[in-house]
Amino acid sequence: MIPLAFFVSLLFLYSLLSRRMEQTIVTAPIVFTVAGMLMFPALQGILKAGFTANAALHVAEVGLVMLLFTDASRTDLKVLRSIKTLPARLLSTGMLLTIVLGAVVARLVFPQLSLWEAGILSAILAPTDAGLGQIIVNSPRVPMRIRQALNVEAGLNDGLSVPFLLFFIAMAAAKIVGGRGSLVEFIVEQLGFGVLVGLAIGLAGGWLLDLARRKEWIAESFEQIGVVALPLLCLVVSDMVGASMFIAAFVGGLAVQIGFKEAGKHSVEFAEEWGQLLNLAVFFLFGMAAVRDWPHFGAASWIYALLSLTLVRMLPVAIALIGTRLSAASVIFMGWFGPRGLASIVLGLVYLEQQAHFPGESTIRFAVQVTVLLSIFAHGLSAMPGIGLYERKIAALPADAPEHLNDQIVTAAPAGTREGEIQVLDSTVPFST
């Protein structure tokens, strides 16, 4: 009960100062990670007795599913259709190059890892974190086209990483994952079923919520509970059919808007807050785990972490964005702000649950921890200054620059819209991809 009491007390204190904290460079993940690190010495006995990777996995999975669903439900579908080429580039060329380059660098930095173990490490660290990137995607100072692209990328790349991760685990273990016949079949199950589950739950759930609201069957408080049940339903059904719960949650969040347009403006706030609570709990637990393993963090882990956050992320993004006419400032901004956090923690726990005691297991675990830890601080502390610098850079661009083309027609946010969000009505201005 001591860790829970400390966490809840910190959560309450942080909520009292949250508006002030949002005006600083110290983010909530930094606060709760540091708190976990500071509390570890007093909780060592408790952690050894009761802290398990399986328990942390469930907390992290639920937190990430909630966050992905709420992010997707707040994504403007009109703008999404206009920027489809940017997320497609980041999720295809960008992600594949990130996994390949990450594996190559891992083999160079950690020669003791096999090729497949290097692939495991790369797949765990390939996805970006929607939670750590919230400051970016919620800032009206960042062009809509850029932040929506980063939001969609973060929402989908963790789910897309899962098949690669489990395939590398299967190859490293020299056997087929779960008896499935091929990588193609497994990808179809994870991604294809994930999309189908998300579409079914999102469309049906949105239609039923809208029907209940129009018929005045549903109370406002239970309208919120109805929305929060949808991402949890995505999680449960995905687990039952062997689909990616992360893909299902994000697709479900997009689909729910079709039948229930108010999902992203009002009711989703309940789901978002609970998702945020779970995310902060994960960072708190991660901070304790990081201190526990700190003596094992060698120089190679720090070198790989630095390369993973810079070269391994930024070079593939730059290649993927060739031909978009985006400025160098935008390419660098999108390349740098691909933080590693909750998604990598979840995938790391999936790996620890699935792994067959590979020789490089500890090397992979420590490298993931160091990379996430470095990202929490580096991306958190650089977010506000980075937005300010980027804002000045794009202000000097011509009016027809690709960065500006989706921000031509903007209105004041309607009642109920969260602070930092804007509403784009429609923009018929064409842009080059």
Question: What is the role of each PLM region?
Answer:
Residues 1-431:
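Transmembrane helical cores of multi-pass secondary ion antiporters/exchangers
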